[in-house]
Structure formats: C-alpha cells, structure tokens
C-alpha cells in the first residue's frame, strides 16, 4: 500500500451538498438529509483497506453509541475496475454483515 499524504479540513468547514447511492437500499442519499444542527462524521472507507478492516467493529460500535449525537455516513470513492471488492454489491454485503448503522455510499 502506498503512503499517501492526506489532510483534514478545518473543523467547522461547511460540507458541500452531494448525492450518492446508498448501497444498502439503492436509494439516492443527499447530504441535505442530515440533521442540520448536529455534527457530522463523514468517513471515507472501502472494503479492501486493511486499516479500515481493522476498525470495522469499532466503527459499528462508535456509530451505535453516538447515533443520537452525530450524523454518520461512510463513502467509498474507489475505482471498482481496479478494486472489484469495493463494488456497490460487495459494499452492501459488508454493511449488512457488519450491521452498519449508517449509510454506506458509492
């Protein structure tokens, strides 16, 4: 796995509007569905990443423990041609298997 520099947006940065497919129910999820007054946790994850796999159970626990205080959403932006295990169908399988309490978007 290549080391890629990434940076965090400043806390309090307004999230841009977006629409992506929720792989679990095949519905379009809009950022406008979020509760406007609560903080949001937007996670960029994928099925094949060993770092994410290591935290699967913790993500589920965190989302369950804080579901009344935070809006959670996970987004995969991977290239499914190069990473077929990150396809929407596989994302749905994983979300159901792990019991995600949050939308898993592609």
Regions found by a protein language model. Name each.
Residues 29-55, 59, 72-73:
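Short active-site neighborhood of thiol/selenol oxidoreductases, capturing the structured segment around
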Residues 77-79:
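Active-site loop/turn elements of alpha/beta-hydrolase fold enzymes
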Residues 51-67, 85-90:
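Typically the conserved alpha-helix immediately C-terminal to a functionally engaged Cys/Sec
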Residues 92-106:
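Short, internal strand/loop/helix patches
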Residues 1-32:
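N-terminal "domain-start" segment that seeds a small globular fold
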Residues 9, 64, 94-96:
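A general structural signal for stabilizing positions within well-ordered secondary structure
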Residues 38-39, 68-71, 99-102:
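Loop/turn elements at helix/coil->beta-strand transitions in domains of secreted/extracellular proteins
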Residues 36, 89-93:
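Short, hinge-like loop/turn segments at secondary-structure boundaries
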